[in-house]
Design a protein with these regions (language model features):
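Phenylalanine-focused residue identity feature
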Residues: 5, 26, 84, 108-109, ...
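Active-site beta->alpha N-cap acidic-glycine motif
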Residues: 45-172, 273, 282-283
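Catalytic domains of cell-wall/extracellular-matrix polysaccharide-remodeling enzymes
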Residues: 140-246, 250-266, 272, 279-280, ...
Length: 285
């Protein structure tokens, strides 16, 4: 039996309120407008290109079978957002295959540097499959991006430029700070006030910044087996009715892709519906 809750809007609002709760363990930064386009022209929401579904939608605009139901429906299932950082890479095709097989969406917080240039076309493939593309970093070098607020936004501008051939810039609405919004490494390079400044600037510019409350721990240094990755995710999700799961599709996290079918199966068996990060935000609007 699948559990139900009042509405998708109510669940999304709950997630937002949880951002100020220490017990929640993740944060969502809400902004009133979309980010300024690369051209610096007036902010005009751009629909997806012909034939490309919006995030969380399948071909023709139909809902992905595993995605969360629309707010108009009376019931709401427990929600899970699968998110992947640090790709695309050689690991990403296996991640996309698992998502397609299970018919569920995910959100990819991408990087774009000299190490993964040949994999950037996978961004288009992910978007066309109904996944959401979001921003992480061009370089992911803490010493560079966190030396100042200006350096951080220069890195984001470069990332947007590099991925522009593969995704409609007007559809990219979210970002994740490398290390998360509560990271301590930024203090080493930019001072104690830097992250607060960046969060404020992100919201002023229209970006939605996103943390997590469940982690696969697949980028913590130790090489994990697929079983360990799955256990970290499912164990961290037990008892939660809203999950934003941090995983990685970097070149060194192949076991995460191996674990993904089991992870998805566990969430389905527990009655969760799958959605992208922006689906949660859009329910608030």
């Amino acid at each position: 039996m699948q559990r139900s809750f009042p509405t998708l809007r109510a669940a999304a609002r709950w997630l937002l309120l949880a951002a100020v709760s220490a017990a929640a363990g993740f944060a969502l930064g809400v902004a009133a407008s979309r980010p300024a386009p690369l051209s610096q022209a007036a902010v005009i929401p751009t629909p997806p290109p012909a034939g490309q579904p919006a995030p969380g939608r399948g071909p023709g605009g139909s809902s992905l079978p595993g995605a969360a139901p629309p707010a108009s429906q009376a019931e709401l299932l427990p929600l899970v957002c699968l998110t992947f950082d640090d790709g695309p890479s050689r690991t990403t095709p296996a991640v996309l295959a698992a998502l397609e097989e299970a018919e569920v969406p995910a959100t990819f917080f991408v990087v774009a540097n000299e190490n993964n240039e040949s994999y950037l076309p996978l961004i288009r493939q992910a978007a066309q499959a109904g996944c959401e593309i979001a921003l992480h970093s061009a370089s992911h070098r803490y010493s560079d991006i966190y030396r100042s607020a200006g350096a951080f936004w220069e890195d984001i501008a470069l990332l947007r430029q590099r991925i522009a051939p593969y995704v409609d810039d007007g559809e990219v609405r979210c970002l994740r700070f490398p290390g998360g919004s509560t990271n301590t490494v930024s203090r080493k390079y930019g001072g104690d006030a830097l992250m607060g400044q960046l969060k404020e600037q992100a919201e002023e510019q229209g970006w939605r910044w996103v943390d997590w409350n469940v982690s696969a721990e697949d980028a913590a240094g130790k090489k994990l087996s697929a079983e360990e990755v799955c256990r970290n995710v499912t164990g961290g999700s037990a008892g939660l009715e809203r999950c934003i799961v941090l995983m990685h599709d970097s070149a060194t996290t192949g076991t995460t892709a191996e674990a993904l079918p089991s992870i998805i199966r566990w969430y389905k068996e527990e009655g969760y519906a799958f959605c992208t990060v922006s689906q949660l935000y859009d329910a608030l609007e």
